Amino acid sequence: MKGQYLMTKKIILIVLALVVALGIGCRSSIVKNVHDAPMTFATENKPSIEQIKKAIIVAGSGLGWRIKSQSPGHLIGTLNLREHTAIVDIKYTTENFSITYNSSTNLSYDGTNIHSNYNGWIQNLEKAIIVQISHI
């Protein structure tokens, strides 16, 4: 009787450990990068690379990103939320743009996976850039 009780207790502990492990795993996702997202514009005239740059900066700033110029066609975006920091490379031409992971703090990045909130931030940034560029 006592042996059966101990066995049941062990099984319950194993099941609880698996549930906790699965719950922790659900909080991370594969890093989302945006590759060569096409741009559409309000007019037939193609905007200049400087207009594109300004539109990306406005889009990111509206979401709390600090966007700094790295080189022509290359911006660095930094988002600080509470104790979390995400840094991305934003590369752009007059045809398309890309957002790629650069580095992070307190987002549990392991080389492939990252805290699931990160992907939401990137998706929001991508949408904001698309909207801002569509008004040029």
Predicted regions and their residues:
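Ser/Thr-rich, low-complexity intrinsically disordered terminal regions
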Residues: 27-136
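Sec-dependent N-terminal signal peptides
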Residues: 13-20
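Bacterial N-terminal signal peptides that target proteins for export
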Residues: 3-13
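Helix-centric, low-specificity signal for extended rod-like, repetitive segments
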Residues: 2-3, 20, 46
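C-terminal motif of bacterial Sec signal peptides marking the signal peptidase cleavage site
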Residues: 22-25
